[in-house]
Amino acid sequence: MTTRQSSLDAYVFEVLMPDLVGHDRRPAAFVVYLYLLHSAEALGRDQVPASLQTIALKTGLSKSAVQVALRHLKRRGLVGEDEVGTQVNPVRQVLRPWRRRLDA
């Protein structure tokens, strides 16, 4: 197993984690978002090729928990609504809405 260092916005831990885990009571959504965000950072782009099975294996969650988490993340505007790619190899768009607010 290789270890990569990742640099994530403080907003993810200071605001998003308490919001998703505490307020929304969706810790799986935070875990899935953290995985997708880390993968996006590693790839250097906002689109991450990741099937339900891949996300489940990488996070330790069940596929059904990943599905529920992705639905919640889409509703919250943290993952793009439209999946690109194929059903077997979907590409998920990772959104960072707080960056738009900070830039405004």
Regions from the PLM with identified roles:
Residues 62-104:
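Winged-helix/helix-turn-helix nucleic-acid-interaction surface
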Residues 1-57, 87:
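Short recognition helix of helix-turn-helix/winged-helix DNA-binding domains
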